[in-house]
Amino acid sequence: MNKVNILPSDTNMKITLFSELSVGISANSILFFAHLCMFFEENRSKPIDLCIAFLSLTQLMLLVTMGLIAADMFMAQGIWDITTCRSLIYFHRLLRGFNLCAACLLHILWTFTLSPRSSCLTKFKHKSPHHISGAYLFFCVLYMSFSSHLFVLVIATSNLTSDHFMYVTQSCSLLPMSYSRTSTFSLLMVTREVFLISLMALSSGYMVTLLWRHKKQAQHLHSTRLSSKASPQQRATRTILLLMTFFVVFYILGTVIFHSRTKFKDGSIFYCVQIIVSHSYATISPFVFVFSEKRIIKFFRSMCGRIVNT
């Protein structure tokens, strides 16, 4: 593993990576603060606010952890020991899984919230925050149980050079695995992620069906005077579809780039592009929430008004 060739010579790649992380950290901090305050301040707190707060907090920690890992990538020489390597890389892998779990839970909860009263999903509408927290915790524990092998595979290689190790940072690398172990872990990971993404896709498809039915009923009842304004249900459904599209596109791109990287001996550029693409959803999704929810804008306006009046 020649570490001189691992570091990208293009400074623009470094600037792009840290710019994305900075923007994402700022946006998720704002989103987390807004939804946490709205959850505790409003008379009827919505469980979906807690779920979005979970998602933004997970993405915030994911981007911060990635920032620490990226800092070690661009150093001249690695300084981390094996404990730091294993802790940060394992924590980062867990946060990526938690992000998927939180996004999946949000889509499902949104489906319950926007379902009509005649739907069989109505009974799930008014579940307490304890149920939301419990479901999120269950998904997280499930994800943790499949990622413990990283503690064995991650090693500190600040002073070692070998073509058999897979580069992670200047300090850390992954040990090679046998074909059978690689296939087993890959199958478990793909099964887990396909299951969660399928739940997101099913909930999104269900919402599209509901939106289509609602639109047909509205056209039938108000055929002569249709309103050009989108209803809250329509806006929420568009937000769900937009988030789902972003997630799937970035997930597929990240997977393609990862497999392209493994085919090249010096995959430094592919590695950096993979990191940028795989963290794009965590950077972009807060802006989708902020611009699609009028409550957030009203919340910040009222907060600014309080500050001015004090």
Swiss-Prot record:
Alphabetized CDD domains for the sequence? 7tm_V1R_pheromone (cd13949)
Task: Write out the topological domains of type Cytoplasmic.
Answer: 41-49, 115-134, 215-238, 290-310
- Molecular functions per Gene Ontology: pheromone receptor activity
Tissue-wise, where is it found?
A: Expressed in 1-4% of neurons of the vomeronasal organ. Only one pheromone receptor gene may be expressed in a particular neuron. Not expressed in the main olfactory epithelium.
The entry's cellular-component GO terms read: plasma membrane
Q: Which organism is it from?
A: Rattus norvegicus (Rat)
- What cystine linkages occur within this chain? 85-172
Its biological purpose is as follows: Putative pheromone receptor implicated in the regulation of social as well as reproductive behavior.
Describe its membrane topology. Multi-pass membrane protein
**What is the similarity comment for this entry?**
Belongs to the G-protein coupled receptor 1 family.
Q: Which residues are glycosylated?
A: 159
Taxonomic classification: Eukaryota, Metazoa, Chordata, Craniata, Vertebrata
Q: Taxonomically, which superkingdom?
A: Eukaryota
Q: What is this protein called?
A: Vomeronasal type-1 receptor 101
Gene that produces this protein:
Vom1r101
